[in-house]
């Protein structure tokens, strides 16, 4: 029979034990729940990429010390230069489901981390530096993580859709094959991205070295997406 876990001080929950651990470690070091969630979300980008990553979005409901609820809707827009004629000129009758010409949107995840972090510093006494919050994820991507059954199953079920997507095979296949459970998965480029965010700040994703690298890759692939379109509103009271 299922039972509820109970805790007096704090509780950290994530779909992967390493994400749970890094969030718990931040709390033990005196961080607040927002800081713990940023660290945990960063780790999810490494260990749980089939569900969320820096290429995704995030949505926050944060309670302040007066129990007021503040919301962050960190969902990026689609490109502003895409319409039906864009696809017709390229010979498409429908929008591709995968690849650089699919219905991609500007990833809002990192922008959401920054807004939540700034809110934490201003309103919740946040004091853990971004360098610490991203460190565990950076190291995990650099040193490698064990492939889980869930990740392997998702790679298997989506292989036919993703195998021709540029970059997929280099990262997620081992000698051209899906890795086995327990195989070490090392993601150097993701580790380097975290390193740049640690060095230059989260905004680097949208206007710095990380931004320029992503835009260069998007241009090479022929994608019309532009990360400079990102504009996430400040935390607001939802009601």
Protein language model regions, located:
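Proteins synthesized as precursors that undergo proteolytic processing into mature forms
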Residues: 1-169, 191-192, 198-202, 206-207, ...
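Glycine-centered loop/turn motifs
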Residues: 169, 176-184
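Single conserved hydrophobic/aromatic residue that forms the stacking wall/gate
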Residues: 230-239
């Amino acid at each position: 029979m299922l039972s509820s876990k109970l805790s007096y001080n704090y509780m950290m929950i994530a779909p992967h034990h390493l994400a749970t651990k890094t969030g718990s470690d931040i709390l033990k070091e005196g961080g607040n729940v927002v800081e713990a969630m940023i660290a945990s979300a960063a780790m999810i980008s490494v260990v749980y990429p089939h569900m969320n990553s820096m290429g995704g979005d995030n949505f926050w409901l944060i309670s302040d010390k007066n129990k007021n609820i503040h919301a962050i809707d960190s969902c990026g827009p689609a490109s502003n230069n895409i319409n039906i004629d864009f696809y017709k000129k390229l010979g498409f009758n429908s929008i591709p489901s995968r690849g650089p010409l699919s219905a991609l949107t500007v990833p809002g995840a990192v922008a959401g981390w920054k807004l939540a972090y700034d809110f934490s510093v201003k309103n919740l006494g946040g004091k853990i530096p971004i360098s610490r919050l991203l460190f565990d994820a950076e190291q995990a991507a650099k040193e490698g993580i064990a492939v889980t059954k869930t990740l392997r199953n998702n790679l298997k079920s989506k292989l036919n859709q993703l195998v021709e997507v540029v970059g997929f095979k280099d990262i997620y296949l081992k000698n051209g094959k899906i890795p086995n459970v327990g195989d070490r998965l090392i993601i150097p480029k993701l580790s380097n991205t975290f390193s740049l965010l640690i060095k230059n700040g989260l905004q680097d994703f949208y206007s710095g070295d990380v931004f320029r690298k992503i835009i260069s890759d998007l241009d090479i692939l022929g994608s019309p997406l532009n990360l400079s379109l990102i504009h996430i509103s400040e935390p607001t009271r939802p009601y």
